[in-house]
Structure formats: structure tokens, C-alpha cells
Amino acid sequence: MKQEIHPEYHQATARCACGNEFTVGSTKESIKVEICSQCHPFFTGKQKLVDTAGRIERFRRKYAKFEQQKSGK
């Protein structure tokens, strides 16, 4: 086996987009994460609603002109 080929493993600071910081073991010195247990809906008990109705309406308006052209031919 080759000697000393393993990366250096040390304590790293993980920073969430919400501002929370916590320490984990990693080969990197710092880690940026988008979501953590302090802001994730499963852990906080708060549900975030996604505006799917608005997206569907925007899609229908965008492609309505194609349907009109198709039925006009």
C-alpha cells in the first residue's frame, strides 16, 4: 500500500444560507450549504408554500398563442 496518500481530515465550519454555523469533520476547511436543520421545514415545523398555481397560469399564458395558431390553421 502507498503511504500518506490520504487527504488531511480536520474540523470544518459549515455555514448555512440562513446564517447558522456548525462544525463537522471534512477534508475541506469550510463548507457552504443552502439549507440546514435550523431552516429546513421538516425540523422547524413550518411549511413553505410553493406558488405552483402562479407557475401553471404563467405557462398557460405563454403557450396560449401557440394553441391559437395551431387551431387557426
From Swiss-Prot:
Gene3D superfamilies: Ribosomal protein L31. The keyword Cytoplasm does not apply. Belongs to the bacterial ribosomal protein bL31 family. Type A subfamily. GO terms for biological process: translation. Binds the 23S rRNA. Keywords: Metal-binding, Ribonucleoprotein, Ribosomal protein, RNA-binding, rRNA-binding, Zinc. One of its GO terms (molecular function) is rRNA binding. Pfam families: Ribosomal_L31. Zn(2+) binds at C16, C18, C36, C39. This is Large ribosomal subunit protein bL31. It comes from the Bacteria. It comes from Desulfosudis oleivorans (strain DSM 6200 / JCM 39069 / Hxd3) (Desulfococcus oleovorans). Binds 1 zinc ion per subunit.
